[in-house]
Amino acid sequence: MNMKKILRRLGAFLLALTLLCSTAYALTVEEALELLEQSYLRELPEEAYEARTLEELFSIVGDPYTYYMSEEEYQAFLSSVEDTVQVTGIGVSIQYTAQGILVADTLKGGSAREAGVLPGDLIVAADGVSCVPADESSHALIVGEPGTRVTVTVLRDGATMDFTLERRVVVIPNTETSVVDGHIGYIECSSFGQTTGELFLEGIQAVNAGVDCWLVDLRGNVGGYTNAAVDAMGAFVGSGLHLYLRDSAGQLFYYAYNQEAATEHTAVILVNSATASASEAFAGGMRDLGRGIIVGSRTYGKGIAQIVYDESNRPEYFDGDAMKLTAYRFYSAGGATNDLVGVIPLLLVSDEKAEAVARAVCGNPQAADSELMVVELGGYLLVVDLSLTEADTLAALFEALPPSALLWRYNGETVLTAEEMARELGVSYQSRWLDDTAESRYADAINTLATYGIVEGNGAGSFYPGETLKRGEVCAMLGRALNLETSTRQRFDDVPAGAWYAGWVNAAAELGLVQGAGDGRFYPDEVLTQEEYLTMLSRLARYLSLHFDYAADSITQEQLDAAAALGFHSWACQGAALLDGGQVLFAPMEELEPGRAILREEAADSLYRVLNAVGLLPV
């Protein structure tokens, strides 16, 4: 079936919103099961067929994105991804303070902006009633019916002044474009509504001639419409296939963009842990296509898409109400999913420093050459104006740089490491690299993983690269790579709930990365062999990447025989052949010793190679 037809009929939403309201159900359990059997991405638990109520059914399914919505809840759901929000008042965004109502910003179309109220003003009274200290009751004084008026007393620079303002309906768009720092095009997007792609395009066209870099702020953006995210991406990258969806049957669909790019400039993309779903699809696609420098913390990790059944496509079941269910996993332009793992920023920095670092790497075309520092990382040249960048911002940048980063002064010839550049500039910072890796042939891979928070040492900076790895430990390593939430559901008799690795083992088992020994036990304290680890890693690669998953189905008998001839057990041959074909083994296939204990440094190197090959860690 044509993808556009599917999406038109069912409305695929990429949202991280969950409605937790008490609902009167009109849909029957039998009808819900029919819809789940038809479209649900995962296999339904056997217990689902014993459910007597919808509430019980959805609890058994255990998917926060699969649920029933009453008519009121459905309307609220649809409103949550609209391109605009309407509020009634004088057109200000505010903060309550002990000194009055602080005007954080004035809104376009509001009477406050037209009358000359400014950000930073304090509203101390409304119609003569004091707003000091400010609270909800103070706010109630300035809102009211459209067309009515209110006189606000404003304190500015020690002087008071009165403004008589009309209360109006003010429309707040979910996407706004402006120019900051005199040369950066800034797009702030809180969600992807139906026309957000058009808003991106219009904003870029409006100011592109006067900027040399774009900054797209997706912090707190929980998602929206898939096609809108693709259209927004297309405004930067132009035509092509930018997103893939795969259903439970393995059928693949795609989203394409068919216009030229509206800008030649690269975008710096701000993200945080609340950046989810469609916004992750945007960020991941920009990363894969070489047009997005992602800055911030690792994103939420919602790489699944939902469809909505309502009266438009199932009139026999619904009358104003609806049911949303997970139907697809989505993959970025390069074939990687962000489901669970999230999008890993090129520059992983704290939320507190993310915006400052993002603006810093946008450079400054007016700076003197002597004040510029260049960072080469992940295929990008990041230009930093040292004269405008605070020392703590530089420290946050240096902490985020992996071993592959190269730095130099714009008018200099010497290429430096982050440590050397920081020393030259007199900036102190806390490196994330591990102290005992210098003699390891895999030092760069280990320290890259450490930079991105994927491996940890012992808390004192040591990794012990030459030591072996236990089965419980590898679950923690893979769990951190995937950004898994630990699970309390006990899967093995010998993994007690109180063990430090228990949550990781349970989570890895639920995802199918690890299996027990067939006797109900996992043997978490046993040393892991090379073939055991590579089997686990091959499952991870298949989960993360379309390319690895398809390659696994294409492995020939000749490849399996070659692995067996090297000493791999039959259950390990496919995994070894897959990783060998993907060129992600820590050593040539013929040099491996399948039954030997794998070393921590070897495990880290192959993990880095997989994350790099699938595009999640492109450094």
State where each predicted segment sits.
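Hydrophobic core
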Residues: L15-L19, T23
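PDZ/PDZ-like domain segments forming the peptide/carboxylate-binding groove
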Residues: L27, D83-P133, Q194
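Interdomain regulatory linker/hinge segments that flank or connect interaction modules
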Residues: L27-E82, T151, R156-G158
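Terminal peptide-recognition signature
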Residues: A32, T53, V92, A112, ...
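PDZ-domain C-terminal substructure recognizer with occasional recognition of PDZ-binding tails
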Residues: I101-L102, V124, S137-T177, T326-A327
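PDZ domains, with a preference for the canonical peptide-binding region formed by the helix
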Residues: L122-T153, L201, A228, K302-N313, ...
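C-terminal "post-core" interaction segments
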Residues: V179-L215, R219-Q430
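N-terminal propeptides
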Residues: Y410-V619
